[in-house]
Design a protein with these regions (language model features):
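Membrane-interface extramembranous regions
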Residues: 2-141
Length: 141
């Protein structure tokens, strides 16, 4: 695979993963909500209440959304310095995992998507922290 092709594939994965986090905004912001798609946390809502849970939902999912979008465009060197794509992707993956854990029951209808999101988060962490992949040469920098 050529470096530009690999860079585009990683860009699309990070971008799609980031956009996927926007699904949490709809119920948290009152745009759409059902019994199987809401902003309540199985752990936090009983402890701190509905409003605080909504705020934490928004903060976590918005941080992951912005972090992955920033990482994707940084990877390409658009608007965000290229050197920041890794430092944005790593905490975004951790934040996403925390958000998915805390709000696991919030998106019952999206169960396969949650499994995919966990897989992408773990892939980001393993590739960037453990394997140190991709190298700058691998992605054409």
């Amino acid at each position: 695979m050529s470096p530009i092709t690999l860079r585009i594939v990683i860009f699309l994965v990070l971008l799609a993963h980031g956009i996927g986090h926007s699904m949490a905004f709809f119920p948290a912001w009152g745009i759409s909500s059902t019994e199987n798609w809401h902003h309540r946390s199985w752990l936090l809502t009983p402890l701190i209440g509905d409003k605080a849970s909504r705020v934490i939902n928004t903060i976590l999912f918005l941080a992951a959304f912005l972090g992955f979008i920033g990482s994707a465009i940084g990877l390409m060197g658009w608007l965000v310095p290229h050197d920041l794509w890794r430092p944005l992707a790593i905490p975004s993956a951790v934040i996403s995992l925390v958000a998915l854990f805390l709000f696991w029951n919030s998106f019952v209808a999206f169960f396969p998507n949650k499994i995919g999101a966990i897989a992408v988060n773990l892939a980001v962490l393993v590739c960037l922290l453990y394997l140190n992949w991709p190298t700058e040469t691998d992605i054409g920098y």
